[in-house]
Amino acid sequence: MFQIGDNIVYPMHGAGIIEAIEEKEFLEEKQQYYVIRMSISNMTVMIPTSKILSSNIRPVTDILALKHIMHIFQHGESDRLLPWKQRYKINTDKIKTGEIQEGAEVVRDLMRMKKEKALNASEKKMLDNAYEFLISELEVIKGITEKQIKSFG
């Protein structure tokens, strides 16, 4: 599915790169593993190739899809009337999908709220993490300009 050198996105961790595909033996069973270096933490993660689909790891978004996401980021509606506990759960679920559009919506909504009033500590941390995940992916999209990246700030 993925090749060495592919840029990927791992939900809740951000963008990374497939550095190797290695065979390891664990409990007397040999398995192929993707060796992924995560760009945010510089941590190396090993995921069995057989579990890659269930891990929700996906390729980095392309520039065409990004234009649609930028439009939603700038013009999409935010639901500001939800109680914070419900909003926090919805936003957590969105981030866990690993989809760039869902993450961008979380960043957009929390940034809009932050302009109106201070976020509580949990939502501030969520905004910081979601923004970091978003930027980590934007930085590796082929053909993206610095201006496009800054439009998410």
Swiss-Prot record:
Disulfide bonds: none annotated. It holds the Pfam family CarD_C. GO terms for biological process: rRNA transcription. InterPro entries: CarD-like/TRCF_RID, CarD-like/TRCF_RID_sf, CarD-like_C, CarD-like_regulator, CarD_C. Belongs to the CarD family. PANTHER family: RNA POLYMERASE-BINDING TRANSCRIPTION FACTOR CARD, TRANSCRIPTION FACTOR YDEB-RELATED. This is Putative transcription factor YdeB. It comes from Bacillus subtilis (strain 168). The gene is ydeB.
